[in-house]
């Protein structure tokens, strides 16, 4: 049908209700504008960070180096037992993993991490400073010391389990690891999977990852829940949390923030 508003070409009302975590999305209106249409709303104005890697004005800071108030223990949701000092938090022995207090779906996530220096060169594979960043309780971006000086002859693991891999699914396009003891960064854009009211998968999750500023996954489809030596598959999910994994190694984390991203209007014909 034709729109009455000037410059608006098509208006389509969507009546599909899809459960997307905390809130349901219903009756979305998709509007197609003319080129250079002055009736098209401008985006919100934010203040960008003064330095790359710092949070913009619309970010939610999950860890600023001072305390773990945005986190709880995976063990029953209690107080975090990790070490907090010198602007970072560090996995403590037998403390267990941690997760955010708030559920988080579509997001831009920045997290910095550091593996211990002085590692015994005989320790390789998955024992080499292992951790992970897990999205919505299920989808893991691997944290590991995958630094190599001679094309993996000194330090090798399976490709879909090295640093920045979507664990058990997709290796990174390149190995952008820094040396042990040096701070590294992940910048992640995550689009959550969608499920219908009947529990069937409507859309797979998608992810883009920059490791130390280098694109290692580009709008990649996630195949399902992270699993060890099992084929990934999806199961219905309403919401989930960001986790930092305790794999028995003293990994450090700092400067963690997110920007919650809106769901794109989704048209079902």
Enumerate the language-model features and the residues they cover:
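N-terminal leader/targeting segments
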Residues: 2-3, 20, 28
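Bacterial N-terminal signal peptides that target proteins for export
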Residues: 2-12
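Residue-identity detector for glycine
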Residues: 7, 21-24
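Bacterial N-terminal signal peptides
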Residues: 13-21
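Carbohydrate-interacting regions of secretory-pathway proteins
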Residues: 24-269
């Amino acid at each position: 049908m034709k729109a009455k508003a000037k410059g608006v070409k098509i208006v389509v009302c969507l009546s599909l209700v899809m459960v997307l975590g905390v809130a349901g999305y219903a009756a979305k209106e998709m509007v197609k504008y003319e080129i250079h249409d002055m009736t098209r709303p401008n985006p919100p104005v934010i203040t960008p960070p003064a330095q790359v890697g710092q949070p913009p004005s619309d970010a939610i800071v999950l860890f600023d180096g001072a305390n773990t108030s945005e986190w709880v223990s995976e063990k029953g949701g209690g107080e975090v037992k990790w070490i907090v000092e010198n602007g970072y938090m560090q996995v403590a022995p037998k403390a267990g993993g941690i997760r955010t207090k708030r559920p988080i779906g579509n997001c831009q996530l920045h997290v910095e991490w550091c593996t211990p220096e002085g590692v015994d060169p005989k320790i390789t594979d998955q024992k080499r400073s292992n951790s992970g960043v897990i999205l919505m309780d299920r989808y893991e971006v691997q944290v590991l010391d995958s630094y190599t000086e001679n094309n993996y002859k000194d330090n090798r693991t399976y490709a879909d389990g090295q640093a920045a891999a979507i664990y058990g699914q997709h290796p990174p396009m390149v190995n952008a690891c820094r040396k042990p003891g040096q701070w590294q960064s992940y910048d992640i854009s995550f689009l959550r999977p969608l499920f219908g009211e009947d529990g069937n998968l409507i859309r797979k999750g998608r992810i883009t990852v920059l490791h130390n500023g280098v694109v290692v996954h580009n709008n990649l489809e996630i195949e399902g829940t992270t699993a060890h030596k099992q084929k990934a598959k999806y199961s219905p999910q309403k919401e989930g949390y960001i986790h930092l994994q305790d794999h028995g190694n003293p990994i450090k984390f700092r400067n963690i923030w997110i920007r919650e991203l809106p769901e794109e209007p989704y048209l079902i014909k």
